């Protein structure tokens, strides 16, 4: 319930705004509580003190380390589980407010079914080139079945899967999200089914390649992780990732560390949470 879950929005807001939740203990790895049991997203328990409202003591257990902090649960619209991540997110959001006027990628990434085609749409023999599942690849969709309400069809597009970490339920281990093998660059005139989200669209391929290098950095994927507690990654999960507006050149973690003032200690934590992926290609 920290960040997602079907039908849990009301419950989450009630919990985050309840100052009587005084202690919240969080285990990323469910096996730390129930050995041999795999519970996706981990385990938490909390103390609700009816007559003693105040700040909440958040206790994180991460790779055998116990970390405590006191903080308001409703500082953000979702609950960031890691206390070590809070100052990093705060810092980057403050800089983004000055440099990019509070713009984040949750306003840029497409919603599900960007072209109105469901995952089970049947490939056609002719029509508009369409990216289906990774197994099927590039086939065709009938022109009359394709909608383009967001005016994406005639642009270059970076396609990303909505389930980039399928199979991973233990979030105490490093998370990858995106890499060369699970993203696609779609040309102008190509669409996709619900098997993809359009992460970014541009009039030039060069800007798409540049944006891909931004998405592949560990810092950006770390910011995404703060809003992800399941294998399903929707546009809303990008709420902490700054949208730089336009993209040029190749982005690196060293560049973003300097821009956002990430310390060595903060980088060590980021590096421990996000797995390394290969350098992004130009294709």
Where are these regions (language model features)?
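Conserved Class I SAM-dependent methyltransferase catalytic core
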Residues: 1-31, 45-46, 211
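Flexible loop/turn segments at secondary-structure boundaries
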Residues: 2-3, 166-169, 277
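Short, amphipathic C-terminal "tail helix"
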Residues: 265-283
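C-terminal substrate-recognition regions of SAM-dependent nucleic acid methyltransferases
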Residues: 31-268
């Amino acid at each position: 319930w920290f960040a997602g879950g079907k039908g849990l929005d009301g419950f989450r807001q009630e919990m985050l705004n309840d100052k009587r939740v005084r202690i919240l203990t969080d285990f990323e790895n469910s096996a730390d509580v129930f050995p041999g049991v795999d519970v996706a997203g981990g385990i938490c328990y909390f103390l609700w003190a009816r007559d003693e409202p105040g700040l909440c003591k958040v206790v994180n257990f991460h790779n055998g380390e116990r970390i405590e902090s006191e903080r308001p649960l409703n500082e953000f619209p979702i609950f960031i589980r890691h206390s070590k991540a809070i100052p990093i997110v705060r810092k980057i959001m403050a800089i983004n407010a000055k440099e990019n006027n509070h713009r984040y990628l949750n306003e840029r990434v497409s919603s599900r079914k960007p072209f109105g085609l469901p995952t089970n749409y049947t490939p056609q023999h002719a029509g508009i080139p369409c990216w289906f599942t990774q197994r099927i690849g590039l086939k065709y969709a009938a022109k009359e079945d394709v909608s383009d309400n967001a005016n994406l069809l005639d642009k270059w597009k970076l396609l990303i899967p909505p389930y980039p970490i399928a199979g991973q339920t233990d979030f105490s281990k490093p998370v990858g999200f995106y890499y060369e093998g699970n993203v696609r660059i779609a040309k102008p005139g190509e669409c996709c089914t619900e098997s993809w989200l359009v992460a970014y669209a541009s009039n030039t391929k060069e800007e798409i390649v540049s944006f891909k290098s931004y998405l592949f950095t560990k810092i950006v994927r770390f910011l995404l992780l703060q809003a992800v507690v399941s294998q399903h990654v929707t546009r809303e999960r990008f709420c902490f990732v700054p949208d730089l507006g336009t993209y040029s050149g190749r982005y690196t973690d060293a560049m973003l560390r300097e821009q956002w003032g990430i310390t060595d200690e903060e980088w060590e934590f980021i590096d421990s949470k996000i797995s390394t992926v290969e350098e992004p290609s130009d294709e």
